[in-house]
A protein has these predicted regions:
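Membrane-embedded beta-strand positions of outer-membrane beta-barrel proteins
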Residues: 15, 63, 147, 162-164
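Surface-exposed, low-complexity/disordered Ser/Thr/Gly/Pro/Asn-rich loops and linkers
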Residues: 128-130
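Active-site-adjacent bridging/hinge elements
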Residues: 114-125, 195-204
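Low-complexity, intrinsically disordered or weakly predicted helical/coil tracts enriched
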Residues: 50, 146-148
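Flexible loop and strand-edge segments within Gram-negative outer membrane beta-barrel domains
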Residues: 1-18, 22-25, 38-123, 136-140, ...
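Intrinsic disorder/low-complexity detector
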Residues: 5, 113, 148, 191, ...
Length: 221
């Protein structure tokens, strides 16, 4: 966060610039080839400028402008986190930790493949959901501007003043979401664990599918 202020006899100014970056609680598991992350993140870029123009000893004109750009990313397709995170914590509480490892590795060299563990009863691997089940991304741009006229009338009555203000606000929100199904595997033949034939597959890996978007734009005067 950087602030700069100053001025002259006829003008005063204050400016502020901010960058904020917050990451989620989870490790990065994503295997998305497009570079989208499985962990949640929130970024904000903000700028503000306040300008006061002393037109006369009694008349002051002010312009205040603020803008911020926010970006949110997260796993799966539920920006409210009610779906993905609630389901993750539910599965952690209801899946025995000793039942199976998080994943298996089969094959050798460049042919190695990660298989996410599961069973006929517990097919929803939490790590697999974060790594492969999709993501959302939303952006929000907010502009706030106001114009103020302040006129002191001490010449008429001491302490008397008139002030007027006009404000204009702009808010644009856009969110898009993608989703995919994922497979889990149960090891049946422990003597041949390096071969995919030793596993029973539940569900199927699918390509990311576009779920749609949500877009709103608001103007206020």
């Amino acid at each position: 966060n950087v602030n700069i202020q100053g001025g002259t006899k006829r003008m005063r100014y204050f400016t502020s610039a901010e960058y904020y970056n917050q990451q989620g609680l989870f490790k990065e598991f994503s295997q998305d080839e497009y570079g989208n992350k499985s962990n949640s993140s929130f970024k904000r870029f903000a700028f503000r400028a306040n300008l006061d123009f002393l037109m006369t000893k009694d008349l002051t004109l002010s312009v205040n402008f603020g803008t911020r750009f926010e970006e949110r990313r997260g796993p799966n397709s539920n920006e409210s986190r009610d779906g993905t995170y609630s389901q993750a914590f539910y599965e952690m509480n209801h899946t025995p930790g000793w039942l199976f490892p998080v994943s298996y590795t089969v094959g050798e060299g460049e042919d190695q493949k990660t298989l996410y563990s599961g069973s006929s009863q517990y097919q929803n691997n939490i790590v697999a959901r974060f790594a492969k089940a999709g993501f959302y991304r939303s952006t929000n741009t907010i502009n706030e501007t106001n114009f103020i006229v302040d006129y002191k009338m001490d010449w008429l009555t001491k302490g008397l003043a008139a002030k007027g203000m006009v404000s204009f606000d702009y808010d644009a929100y856009y969110m898009r979401a993608f989703n995919a199904d994922f497979a889990t595997y149960e090891l049946n033949d422990r003597t041949n664990y390096n071969s995919i034939d030793a596993y029973t597959q539940f569900n199927t890996d699918t390509e990311l599918a576009y779920l749609g978007n949500n877009q709103t734009t608001t103007y206020k005067l």
